[in-house]
């Protein structure tokens, strides 16, 4: 069975975590909120592996990554929603995951993120297939709103299925109409 890692998989990406678990992956989910993790596990107890660690603590994160890979095999897919207070997380992933085989990194970004700048900063090695997902907003009946968790998960699943280099969920324009 393939192995996926989801950072941010108990909140807005919970449905994506469950989808991965129903589509051939054992899914290691990093989360700090015990209640959200329990709700996620209840949706698929066999397919979800809880990883209770604060991803900003990269020393503990690296230890957890080593342990889960030892138990569940190498990680082939990473879905990462990382806040700006975790700038060392992606370098930690790159150094902690396989150096010998290819793996995919789907990096979820906020609507205001500069994807070109982020891609330069991330600087992934050639064995890491890097994809960017940018979360936008919705325009409806002349008003705008942020995306729902369902819309986010649906868009992220489309991005994973299509392996699109840069994928926008919702819209980013007109920028002045964002909520």
Predicted regions and their residues:
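Canonical Rossmann dinucleotide-binding motif of NAD(H)/NADP(H)-dependent dehydrogenases/reductases
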Residues: 1-28
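Conserved glycine-rich Rossmann-like NAD(P)H-binding loop of the short-chain dehydrogenase/reductase
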Residues: 24-39
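Hydrophobic anchor at the start of a short beta-strand
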Residues: 27, 48, 130
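Rossmann-like short-chain dehydrogenase/reductase
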Residues: 36, 59, 65-129, 134
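Rossmann-fold cofactor-recognition segment
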Residues: 41-61, 80-83
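A short acidic, often aromatic-flanked loop/helix-cap motif at beta-alpha or helix-coil junctions
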Residues: 56-60, 113, 137-145, 174-177
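Active-site capping/gating segments
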Residues: 126-148
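C-terminal helical subdomain
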Residues: 141-179
């Amino acid at each position: 069975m393939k192995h996926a890692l989801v950072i941010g998989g108990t909140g807005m990406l919970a449905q994506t975590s469950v989808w991965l678990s129903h589509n051939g992956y054992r899914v290691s989910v990093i989360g700090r909120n015990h209640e959200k993790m329990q709700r996620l596990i209840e949706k698929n107890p066999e397919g979800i592996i809880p990883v209770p660690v604060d991803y900003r603590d990269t020393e503990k994160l690296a230890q957890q990554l080593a342990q889960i890979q030892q138990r569940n095999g190498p990680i082939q897919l990473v879905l990462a929603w990382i806040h700006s207070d975790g700038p060392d997380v992606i370098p930690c992933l790159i150094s902690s995951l396989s150096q010998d085989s290819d793996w995919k990194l789907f990096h979820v970004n906020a609507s205001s993120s500069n994807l070109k700048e982020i891609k330069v900063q991330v600087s992934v090695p050639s064995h890491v297939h890097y994809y960017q997902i940018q979360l936008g907003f919705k325009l409806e009946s002349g008003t705008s709103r942020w995306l729902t968790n369902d819309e986010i998960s649906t868009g992220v699943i489309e991005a994973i299925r299509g392996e699109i280099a840069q994928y926008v969920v919702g819209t980013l324009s007109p920028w002045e109409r964002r909520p």
